[in-house]
Amino acid sequence: IFILYYCHKNKVSNLKFLDIVVVGLILAQAIGRWGNFFNQEAYGAITTKQELINMHIPQFIINGMYIDGNYYQPTFLYESILDLLGFVILFLIRCYPYLKIGFLTGLYLIWYGVTRFFVEGMRSDSLMLGPLKMAQVVSIMMIICGIYFCFIRNIKSKKFENLYQEGGIRHEV
């Protein structure tokens, strides 16, 4: 709601603003996933210590995944790594001069939606909605919105714009 207010007040396109923000947002999410590790929450299925060692998981993470007498899959780590990869992709293409407004937002929604869908499938402590976990339902909606912003909406738009060119988002001091 604040983003909508800010963009309206400063006469900035909501999607253009989001295209700039999502690059840092996915990096923040990659870092934020480590909070799940420190809080020992949002972990995966029970596993063995040897399986974690075979996956070349660092020892401090293996130790942290020992909860209530069992070892668990470090789903926070999988999601953090995938979010970092998503950050690299968004970071590399963000300055491509022929992006349509909303494309980066759509790509973020697709990447993060797919990542969350699969990682949630590995978690053992999720809220269920029928056969799917609630977060997976939200992920499907994110993917659908992302496809809309990346492809369907952009097919109609003929305008390309460099997000970081002079005259982009106004900064008032």
Role assignments for model-derived ranges:
Residues 1-173:
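A feature for loop-to-transmembrane-helix boundaries and adjacent hydrophobic helices
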